[in-house]
Amino acid sequence: MSLELTSGAFATLVIGLAVVLPVATVVAWGRVRGGAVLRTGQRWLLVVAAQAAGILAVLVVINNQFGLYSGWDDLLGRTVQDSSAVVLTPQVRTGDPSSGSSGRPSSGGRAPTAAPVPWVNGLPAGFSAYDGNRTFLAMVAVPGSSSPMRLYVSLPPQYDQAAYAHKQFPVVELLHGYPGTPTTWFHAMDVRARLQAAMGAGATPFVLAVPQISVPGAPDLECTNLPQQPQVATFLTTEVHAILASHFRVRTDRAGWGLMGYSEGGYCAAALTLRHPELYAAGVDIAGYGQPLSAFFDRYPAQRAAGRLSVLLRGAPPVAIYASASAQDPQSSGALTALTHDVRPPTTVTTRLYAQGGHNTSDWSAQLPADFQWLSGHLGGVVG
């Protein structure tokens, strides 16, 4: 039986304790033995244990609902890395476009690339197998940080089929929320099954790139390069592109790359798409918001102002944005209004306001097939 933080067994155990301990407290209340002080102490222990079990059960349910922490290492802030693992440092051939300024597609609109890397024993060099579902994990060096970041890559079934042996696949880069973890996409969001369902209805077989957006030990940088801080935007854009291009059969033109994120990752997906039209053609913002909300940005008012989606839309980059929110989620639904108000051609913004739903992964997961269908209509398909 697995007692991982997000496992059903652990949730059942904790909820069971939350039910049993209050009952046990009532039953044992009049049966404790000893002097008055000892009896009082035992009763207090029973009450505290019952209360703690109830609080823990609530926290476990909230964590499983929102995908805040994927496991014990994530909860305790420990970086998951095999001591023998290779930390990839991409060698990018082109200049770094990820400083945060808006750009325009270069001629050909191609992403940064690196020299081809061979596969060894069925694995891309520098990657390890994640869970046996054609999903791989690498640790990647981040400029300005001594802590590497996780990058997961999940391949569609078509990738291994003979008919696609020499084809290049489009990529969707998935950004999680904060606090959160990349593996929330595989568990609470169940993204691989959702993509499979979308493909059954005609959606494109995307390669999924799932990077970590929060640098271990650093403040919440909201996918932005800030002075004297880890350059997380460079990692998410230039480095992720270079690693995918050198390790997998993927498209390197902007028409073959899109972004999707939820909550903070939704803001990041919209902001990075608007900032980097030379890299991305489309972005999906699920329950995001209109500007950096991290208190750390109080130190960087200019960067916070520049990071507002209303400001980024003024540059009118040639990209497409799809934003969705629930009417019962005031912060993200308010951001939809701002997006439609500030958009200018050739930028296009499509919005969807759901009448019901909360700020949680169960609602967002259900929306994913429609999100992949939208991306299929705004990104290029498999080529070669």
Put a short name on every predicted segment.
Residues M1-G384:
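Non-catalytic cap/lid and distal C-terminal segments of serine-dependent acyl enzymes
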